[in-house]
From Swiss-Prot:
Topology class, membrane: Multi-pass membrane protein
Role of this protein: Fluoride-specific ion channel. Important for reducing fluoride concentration in the cell, thus reducing its toxicity.
Pfam families in UniProt: CRCB
Subcellular location as annotated: Cell inner membrane
Predominant subcellular localization, coarse grouping: membrane
Transmembrane residue ranges: 6-26, 37-57, 67-87, 96-116
Descriptive protein name: Fluoride-specific ion channel FluC
Biological source species: Tolumonas auensis (strain DSM 9187 / NBRC 110442 / TA 4)
Length: 127
C-alpha cells in the first residue's frame, strides 16, 4: 500500500507541475480558451492511449508503474476541473459559441488523441 501511495504521489506531483508549466507558457497567448489547459488535456489523452496499450501488453509489470503513470502523472496533468471552470466562465459571460467550441475541442480532441496514442503503440509494437 505504501508503494502505491508513493507512486501516485510522485506521478501526481510531476503531472501537476507539468500542467502548471503548460499554463505559464501558453495561457497568455489566447486567454479566451487558455491553450495550456487544452494542451494538457490533449497531451494527456495521447499519453493515456500510449500508457493503456503499453500496460496491456506488459501485464507482468508491478502495478505501481501503472499507478505512477496513469493515476498519478496523467491524473495530475489532465484537468477536468479547470476545463469545467473555464467553460462555466464563458457561459456566465454569455459566450455560448466559445463555450461550445471549448467543449468540442477538449472532448473530441482528447478522444482523437487517445486513439492516436493507441495507434502509435500499435505501430511501434509491429516493428
Amino acid at each position: 500500500m505504501l508503494y502505491s501511495v508513493l507512486a501516485i504521489s510522485l506521478g501526481a506531483s510531476a503531472g501537476a507541475v507539468s500542467r502548471w508549466l503548460l499554463g505559464l507558457g501558453f495561457n497568455t497567448l489566447f486567454p479566451t480558451i487558455p491553450p495550456g489547459t487544452l494542451l494538457a488535456n490533449l497531451l494527456g489523452g495521447y499519453l493515456i492511449g500510449i500508457a493503456v496499450t503499453f500496460f496491456a501488453a506488459n501485464p507482468n509489470l508491478p502495478p505501481e508503474w501503472r499507478l505512477l503513470v496513469i493515476t498519478g502523472f496523467l491524473g495530475g496533468l489532465t484537468t477536468f476541473s479547470t476545463f469545467s471552470a473555464e467553460v462555466t466562465t464563458l457561459l456566465q459571460q454569455g459566450r455560448l459559441l466559445w463555450a461550445g467550441g471549448a467543449i468540442a475541442v477538449h472532448v473530441i480532441g482528447s478522444l482523437v488523441m487517445t486513439l492516436l496514442g493507441m495507434a502509435t503503440m500499435s505501430l511501434l509494437q509491429r516493428s
